[in-house]
Structure formats: structure tokens, C-alpha cells
């Protein structure tokens, strides 16, 4: 009571912002009064009028309220829905680049039509981002009706959209798309060889639905495009078999940090088993001998697969493949694989086909991707718990928008039991009570395993129900849409159909099958169904509305709030209650020993529940600790990714410059001049005496780079390094001029551009591989009293400089050996690029033989003499 009294006196920042905006809403109503008289064509023509005003440099905010009024009127005429005042407030806040928190059922999808229309008038594109293909398609079809009526083009991109259709969709005024498709299209675009092959047109304005899920839950996992490497996978099943023979004394597991390590007993046992099957190196009996170090990687990953990763919790097996389950949404992530051999270890554990390990070709986090947008905003039902992170990472303010009708949902206190068995018995009893009076129930679980366990108990009681988890995700929308019908019992994992409202009495549109009906028959049947649903809705309301049951607390308070928010939409009644046990993961791993000891001391009897403020406070504290821990992980990931992001910007900028350039001679000449200066200074140090010059070394090096034998006399006749540089530069440029004469300037330019882009991609890919390895072991620097992040920054920068040097060296070396056989192939760009590729492949052999000829006998672990900074075996010695 005291808290409510204080809140009534001291308004929150959100309250003050909303109060200021309420006066602005009147401007929308004023503008709308004249619009109602317009014909459809006249209303549509307002779009071209707005565009003309913006083209004359009128500020977009000047037309905001009139544009909102146009959208409101168009929505009324097309889909029969009019924006509430609260939705207009939400639209204003989204246009301002804020995150709005709106309760379930308050019409966030409709709100997005306001700022998306307004900003689409600028002609730079608006992306409305959703969490899955179904919602992207649904919103595009439904809300797109409003936009198309107003002569605004609308596109939709899902995982099944082809390249041509993607380009058309991105060029639309408004594009509905998932976050994954956006990120992967960005990475793919930066692997294309021409601007025409790219599909995106830049990052202007994005409205992110379920923004907390995308920018927070998924921020820990970077988007990666990878390619297979020819690593040996034969060891995974062998090591897997040995790991199954270990027991709990052979390893120590920390569930809180999700880490597992072998004990001395486990190491000894493994060494014995490895020796018996002749896996250890000859004359070696220790796993940690240098010759056996590679085995540790396989052992660690297999141990993790068996102890930390559970089937139907962290992953599922479908059609002979291990598929990751998103821990936050409960959905499958079909296109993703665990890195560093973990996925292969899981495949060995589940005895399915083991695929090769992958190497990163391109990578970006959602954090860095969405920060590229000129303007960003978002919507969700639960954002206030993450307001600090959204502000610190993305500079986004969160504002809570009031509900249109007062919330009538009742949230009961948690019930805590000593065992899972007692907890499930209480849940089943409550479900039976609700079922007997016709009250619909939604049961939220944290994993597939738990949802199927509960389903078996309901089957044993002969209670009909639906199960919604990653195994049945294809029926997600239809199951959730009907979860508000009389006697409907629905068990769902975290996914819980976010984005699909649970309507009391059911959803008429989804109940009527239109496939075999004429439009007239469909409308008639829909009318009858809606009347039946209205009657059913009254019965459900009288029974108490939808009852949401939580079977355990999640690690994040936000996900608990999302589950509660499934009921009580638009002022409907609803009830929620969480059932917990001391055996739940959250209680077992994170709750304090003090709480557990108190409960053990109390000595709960079988089937007896406890309600205690200390328990609720302890749970809230445990959740806050986990949220803080996950926030630190995300912040840390961003700090490391920022290092790569700066480098990524340089590479992508250089790549795009080359692709867009009609003439790459400037790039070629600049890099040639830089390389020649560096090479000359290596053999003729600045301000050195002539007798200290290493002319023989310089001649060999120049021949290795440009495939040209210099006359010693020409260099010996000069008296300064500057003149040597001029002579060598002229010689190199003469090579390029000769190529233009031999093949034509256009053909040579196309081939050189192709060589530059391919060489850039190759060196960048190798650099990412090196950074991956650097990142894996960098945390160990802390033991040497060094900051791992600073060490990573320093070494990553050094590696980047070495990569740029290697790029320069390899590119010029390849151009100098360019040969296009015009006699045997037509003079077209496509065939020219193909010929250029073939020449590059054949040239590699030449490079390698030259490397051994001029470098002599070199250890494979020595640094390559070409100054790339790489080991010889990874550079010129890699092609042996």
C-alpha cells in the first residue's frame, strides 16, 4: 500500500513522458476530422503530397501527426481497426527512436504501422524486424494491406525467399523480415563480387518487435557464415566411447558457470584407456605430453557434450541431425551449429553422422549489426527489467505505454514444494479443477523434456491437451490461437507463441478453413463462428479467464513476466501462478544455501506447499544474479567483437570501394608503391652506406614478387635508395602497362579487380581463423596478471597489420603473374573471371616452387620470409 501511495505522488519518467504526449494526440484527431470526408483515391494521394513536402526539405516531424491520422483512417477503411490513443502514443515514441513496453494484446503490430509509414516517405527503406518467419509473413500480409492502400510498397523476406525476391523486398518502402535473415544477408552481401549481386540497400530505420529477445537474449550468439575445413573427425567417436566409461569421480562440474574439468583420477583413467587402444603417441604415457596435446580438445568437448548438454533441453535429434534449441525461445535453430568441435562431439554422442568442423568466413553480432542503423526503435511486453542494458549498449530509452483498459489479471503467490513429484501433483490437481469448470489453462515449461513429462501425467489422468514445443513448432500459431477456448489445456515451452494473441473463446479466422469455400460461403461461416465464439468467451470469462501456470522460475525475470503476460489481454480477466520445488534447477544451482537449509529445517511434508517472503526474495535475488552474469557476458562479448568490428569496417569498406570502382589501377599502384618502399628499406636501410646495401637480396625478393629479373648494374649505378625505389616502381608499372596492351585495359582491369577481391577474402578468412584461436586462449593471460581484453586488442591489432601486409604482398605477386589466354576463351567478363581463377590456381604452384627456391630449406614452424607474419606452413609452405 505504501509503495502504491509513493508511486502516486512521485511519477516515473515514463509517466511524465506519456503526460507530455497526450496533448500531441489531439493534433492527430484534429487532422483526422477532415480526412474522413476524402475518397479512397484522395486519401491515397496524401502519400505523394507528403513525399513532395519532404523533397522540399520540410522536416519530417512537421507532417508526423497528419501522417499518423492518414494511417489511422486507412486502417479503419481496410482492416476495420482504428488505432487507440495509447497506440498513437506508442507510434510517436517509436518515431523518436525509443523502446516501448506494451502489454500483451495491446496491438504492438498495429502501432508499428504509424512510424513505418511516416519514415517510409523518406524513400530510404524501413525494416520491421520480427523473431520468426510466421510473424514476418503474417504482419506483411495483414498490416501491408494498410500500406498498399496508401501506395506504399511492402516486401517480406523469410528463410525461403530467393535472391531475386529478396532484392525486390529490400527495395520496397517497408520490409518485414526476421533478425537472422537481416544479419546473414548483410554478411552474404559482403562476400559478393559485384554490387548487382547484393540484395540490401543500407541500414536506415528499423523497428524491432520483441526487441528484448533479439537485442538481449540472442546477443550472446554471433551470426557466423562458415565453410567446412578438412579436419579429421574420426577421433570423435573413439573419444566419445571412452568418455562414457567415466563416472562422477572422474570430473568436476560447475553448473552455475557451465564448466567441467577432469580430476586427476579421470586423467589417469583416460591415459590408461588411450594407451590400450594405441591413441597416445609412441613412447609417451601422459596426455599432456606435447605429442598428445591435440587429444585434449576432443576430450574436453566430448566431456561437455555428455555432462553439460542434455537432449530435448539444449538440443534435439531430428532426421539424423543434432539441432540446437534456443534456450530463450525454445525454438529450434536449424541453420546453426556449435563451434570448436562441440557439435561434432554431440553428433558422436547421439551416434549420428559427424560433419566436418567449420571455419569462420564472416561474422557479426546483433549488437554491432543493429548499431549500424541511423535510427533504431523497438517494442516488447517486457523491457523495463533490461532498461539499463538497452541504454548502455544501444543508447535506447525505454518508455512504458499505459494499457487501453485496466489490467484485471490476478498474480498469485508462488507455491514451493520439496520435490518435483509433489509439485507436479499440485499442478495436475489445479489443471483438473480448471478443466472441470471449463477454464482454459496455459502451462509454461522450460524445456521439451519437462513439457513431455507433464504431458504424460495429463495423459494418465485422461485430460485432453495440446503440446507446443520445438518438436511441434509448425502448429505454433494455431495451437496458441485456440488456447483460450473452453476446457483448452495447452503445454508450451518458452516459445509460448509470442506474437500470437490468446483470445478468450478462440480465434474465428483460424477456426474456419477457407480452402474449399467461396468468398461468400467463407464470410457466412465466419459470421456464425464469431457468434459461437462470443458465447464461448462469456463462459470463459465467467470461469475466470485464461489460467497461466508456470512449472518453474526461469533464469530471467523477464521470461517469467512474458509467461504471465499471455493472459489478461485488453482488460480480459486472467490468473497466474508459479509452482516450484527444491529440485528445480534455479533453486538447486542458484538459490542460497541459507534458504535451502531453512526449508529443510521446516521439514515440508509430502504434498505440502510453503509460502514465505524470504523464498520469493531469495528467488528474485538469484534471478538478478543470473541476469547480471549474463549481462556481463554480453558486455564482454561486445568488447571483444568491437575489436573485430573496427577491422571488419576497414575490410568491408576496402572491398566495397574495389567493387564499385571502374578502374582499380589506383589501388594497384598505391599498394605497389607501398610494397616497393617497404621492400627497399628492408635491404637498403634508410641513411645507410652503400657498402651496407644487400642488393643481391633485393633482386631475389623483387623477382619473387614481380617475377622479373633485375640487372644488378642498374641498381649498383644508383647512389640513393630513393632512386632505387623510382627504378623499381617504374619497372613494376611497366609490367602493368604491358598487361593492358596484351589483353586490353578493360580485360586487365576486370581480372585485377577479381584478383584483389579474392585475395582480400582469402586473407580476411585466414585472419578470422587466427583471431578465433587467439580468443580461445586469451583468458589464460589473467594468470600472468595481464588484462585479457587489452592483450587481445594489442595482439589483434598486430595480426591485422600483418594481414594487410600479407594482402598487399600476395595481391601484387598474383597480378604480376597474371595471364589471360584470349585465344582459347571468348572476351567476356564471366569467362575472363573464370580464366583468372584458373590462372590463380596454376600460379599457386609457381609461387610455392619459388618460395622453396628463394627461401631455401625452412622449418614449417618458422615465420615465413615473405613478412606476412604467419608461420611458413600457413603461408608459402602451406601449398607444398
UniProtKB/Swiss-Prot annotation:
Its EC number is 7.4.2.8. It holds the Pfam family SecA_PP_bind. InterPro entries: Helicase_ATP-bd, Helicase_C-like, P-loop_NTPase, SEC_C_motif, SecA, SecA_CS, SecA_DEAD, SecA_motor_DEAD. It comes from Orientia tsutsugamushi (strain Boryong). It comes from the Bacteria. The keyword Transferase does not apply. This is Protein translocase subunit SecA. ATP binds at residues 87, 105-109, 501. SMART domains: SecA_DEAD (SM00957), SecA_PP_bind (SM00958). One of its GO terms (cellular component) is cell envelope Sec protein transport complex. May bind 1 zinc ion per subunit. GO terms for molecular function: ATP binding; metal ion binding; protein-exporting ATPase activity. Its cofactor is Zn(2+). It is a peripheral membrane protein.
Amino acid at each position: 500500500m505504501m509503495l502504491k501511495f509513493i508511486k502516486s505522488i512521485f511519477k516515473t519518467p515514463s509517466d511524465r513522458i506519456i503526460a507530455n504526449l497526450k496533448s500531441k494526440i489531439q493534433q492527430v484527431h484534429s487532422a483526422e476530422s477532415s480526412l474522413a470526408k476524402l475518397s479512397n483515391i484522395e486519401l491515397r494521394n496524401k502519400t505523394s503530397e507528403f513525399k513532395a513536402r519532404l523533397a522540399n526539405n520540410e522536416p519530417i516531424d512537421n507532417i508526423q501527426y497528419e501522417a499518423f491520422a492518414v494511417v489511422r483512417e486507412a486502417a479503419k477503411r481496410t482492416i476495420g481497426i482504428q488505432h487507440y490513443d495509447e497506440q498513437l502514443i506508442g507510434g510517436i515514441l517509436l518515431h523518436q527512436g525509443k523502446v516501448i513496453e506494451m502489454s500483451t494484446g495491446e496491438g504492438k503490430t498495429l502501432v508499428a504501422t504509424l512510424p513505418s509509414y511516416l519514415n517510409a516517405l523518406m524513400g530510404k527503406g524501413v525494416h520491421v524486424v520480427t523473431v520468426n518467419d510466421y510473424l514476418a509473413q503474417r504482419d506483411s500480409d495483414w498490416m501491408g494491406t494498410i500500406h498498399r492502400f496508401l501506395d506504399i510498397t511492402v516486401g517480406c523476406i523469410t528463410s525461403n525467399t530467393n535472391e531475386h525476391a529478396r532484392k525486390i523486398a529490400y527495395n520496397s518502402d517497408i520490409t518485414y523480415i526476421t533478425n537472422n535473415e537481416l544479419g546473414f544477408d548483410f554478411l552474404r552481401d559482403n562476400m559478393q563480387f559485384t554490387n548487382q549481386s547484393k540484395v540490401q540497400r543500407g541500414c536506415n530505420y528499423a523497428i524491432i518487435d520483441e526487441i528484448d529477445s533479439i537485442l538481449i537474449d540472442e546477443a550472446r550468439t554471433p551470426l557466423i557464415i562458415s565453410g567446412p575445413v578438412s579436419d579429421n573427425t574420426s577421433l570423435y567417436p573413439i573419444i566419445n566411447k571412452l568418455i562414457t566409461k567415466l563416472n562422477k569421480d572422474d570430473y568436476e562440474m560447475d553448473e552455475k558457470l557451465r564448466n567441467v574439468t577432469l580430476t586427476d583420477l579421470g586423467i589417469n583413467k583416460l591415459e590408461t584407456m588411450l594407451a590400450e587402444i594405441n591413441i597416445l603417441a609412441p613412447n609417451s604415457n601422459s596426455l599432456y605430453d606435447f605429442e598428445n596435446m591435440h587429444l585434449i580438445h576432443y576430450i574436453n568437448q566430448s566431456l561437455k557434450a555428455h555432462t553439460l548438454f542434455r537432449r530435448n533441453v539444449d538440443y534435439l535429434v531430428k532426421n539424423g541431425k543434432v539441432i540446437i534449441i534456443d534456450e530463450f525461445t525454445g525454438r529450434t535453430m536449424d541453420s546453426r551449429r556449435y563451434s570448436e568441435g562441440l557439435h561434432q562431439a554431440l553428433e558422436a554422442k547421439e551416434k549420428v553422422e559427424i560433419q566436418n568442423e567449420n571455419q569462420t568466413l564472416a561474422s557479426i553480432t546483433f549488437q554491432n549489426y543493429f548499431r549500424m542503423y541511423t535510427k533504431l526503435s523497438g517494442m516488447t511486453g517486457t523491457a523495463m527489467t533490461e532498461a539499463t542494458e538497452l541504454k548502455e549498449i544501444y543508447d535506447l530509452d525505454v518508455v512504458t505505454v499505459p494499457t487501453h483498459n485496466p489490467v484485471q489479471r490476478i498474480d498469485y503467490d508462488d507455491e514451493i514444494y520439496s520435490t518435483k513429484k509433489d509439485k507436479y501433483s499440485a499442478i495436475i490437481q489445479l489443471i483438473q479443477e480448471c478443466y472441470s469448470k471449463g477454464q482454459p489453462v496455459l502451462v509454461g515449461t522450460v524445456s521439451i523434456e519437462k513439457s513431455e513429462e507433464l504431458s504424460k501425467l495429463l495423459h494418465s489422468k485422461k485430460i485432453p491437451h495440446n503440446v507446443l514445443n520445438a518438436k511441434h513448432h509448425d502448429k505454433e500459431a494455431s495451437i496458441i490461437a485456440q488456447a483460450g477456448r473452453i476446457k483448452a489445456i495447452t503445454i508450451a515451452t518458452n516459445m509460448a507463441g509470442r506474437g500470437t494473441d490468446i483470445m478468450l473463446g478462440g480465434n474465428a479466422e483460424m477456426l474456419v478453413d477457407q480452402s474449399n469455400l467461396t468468398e461468400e460461403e467463407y464470410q457466412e461461416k465466419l459470421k456464425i463462428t464469431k457468434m459461437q465464439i462470443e458465447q464461448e468467451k462469456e463462459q470463459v470469462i465467467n470461469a475466470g479467464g485464461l489460467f497461466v501456470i508456470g512449472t518453474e522460475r526461469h533464469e530471467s525475470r523477464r521470461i517469467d513476466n512474458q509467461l504471465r503476460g499471455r493472459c489478461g489481454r485488453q482488460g480480459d480477466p486472467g490468473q497466474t501462478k508459479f509452482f516450484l520445488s527444491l529440485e528445480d534447477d534455479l533453486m538447486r544451482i542458484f538459490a542460497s544455501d541459507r534458504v535451502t537449509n531453512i526449508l529443510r529445517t521446516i521439514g515440508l511434508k509430502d504434498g505440502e506447499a510453503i509460502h514465505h517472503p524470504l523464498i520469493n526474495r531469495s528467488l528474485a535475488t538469484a534471478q538478478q544474479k543470473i541476469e547480471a552474469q549474463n549481462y556481463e557476458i554480453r558486455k564482454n562479448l561486445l568488447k571483444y567483437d568491437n575489436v573485430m568490428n573496427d577491422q571488419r569496417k576497414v575490410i568491408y569498406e576496402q572491398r566495397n570501394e574495389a567493387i564499385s570502382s571502374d578502374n582499380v589501377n589506383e589501388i594497384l599502384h598505391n599498394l605497389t608503391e607501398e610494397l616497393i618502399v617497404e621492400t627497399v628499406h628492408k635491404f637498403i636501410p634508410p641513411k645507410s652506406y652503400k657498402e651496407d646495401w644487400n642488393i643481391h637480396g633485393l633482386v631475389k625478393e623483387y623477382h619473387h614478387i614481380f617475377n622479373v629479373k633485375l640487372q644488378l648494374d642498374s641498381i649498383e649505378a644508383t647512389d640513393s635508395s630513393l632512386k632505387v625505389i623510382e627504378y623499381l616502381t617504374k619497372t613494376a608499372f611497366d609490367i602493368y602497362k604491358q598487361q593492358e596492351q596484351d589483353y586490353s585495359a578493360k580485360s586487365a582491369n576486370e581480372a585485377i579487380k577479381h584478383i584483389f577481391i579474392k585475395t582480400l577474402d582469402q586473407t580476411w578468412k585466414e585472419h578470422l581463423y587466427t583471431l578465433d584461436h587467439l580468443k580461445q586462449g586469451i583468458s589464460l593471460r589473467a594468470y600472468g596478471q595481464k588484462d585479457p581484453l587489452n592483450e587481445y586488442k594489442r595482439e589483434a591489432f598486430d595480426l591485422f597489420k600483418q594481414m594487410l601486409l600479407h594482402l598487399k604482398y600476395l595481391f601484387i605477386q598474383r597480378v604480376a603473374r597474371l595471364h589471360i589466354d584470349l585465344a582459347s576463351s571468348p572476351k567476356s567478363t564471366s569467362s575472363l573471371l573464370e580464366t583468372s581463377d584458373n590462372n590463380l590456381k596454376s600460379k599457386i604452384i609457381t609461387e610455392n616452387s619459388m618460395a622453396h627456391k628463394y627461401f631455401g630449406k625452412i622449418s614449417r614452424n618458422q615465420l615465413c620470409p615473405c613478412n606476412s607474419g604467419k608461420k611458413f606452413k600457413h603461408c608459402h609452405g602451406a601449398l607444398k
